[in-house]
Amino acid sequence: MKSGRRPRGFGGNIWTLVAAAFCLSALALMGAEKDKKKVEWDASKLAPASDKKGLTYEKDIKPLLEKSCVKCHSGEKPKSKYRMDSLASVIKGGESGDAAIIPGNSAKSPMVAYVSELVEDMEMPPTDKRDKYPALTKEQIGLIRAWIDQGAK
């Protein structure tokens, strides 16, 4: 190769390559954020919270979840990576990274919206599994709401 000539191929400008890689990475991240939908629902359609006081996870809520939710949302590979077999995991949520329960605010807790069938394609339990796992009643949802509003303890 003669001195002063650029090698064949890319052209020798590494900074152009770095800038292009940076731009492509930024575009990929923007696309990923766009795909993550913000889930919204009309809280006015929720069943009213129960008047019952002193609700606890172990005594009042866990039995409801065991009947309708825990079979799919427990174990090594829970659906949507959301475990519902302990208080901490019920609150934490799953693969979305968002909390499923917001202690003190049942109307903004996604889990309540899902069991209330207010989010399309997120009805829980799924309608095609209701022969094995019954949907929660309005009264049961009201208990869950009251428990959350009381701090989800």
Where are these regions (language model features)?
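N-terminal secretory signal peptides that target proteins for export/translocation
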Residues: 1-12
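Aromatic- and Gly/Pro-enriched helix-to-coil junctions and flexible linker segments
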Residues: 2, 29-153
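Beta-strand-connecting loop/turn residues
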Residues: 14-15, 80
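Bacterial N-terminal signal peptides
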Residues: 16-26
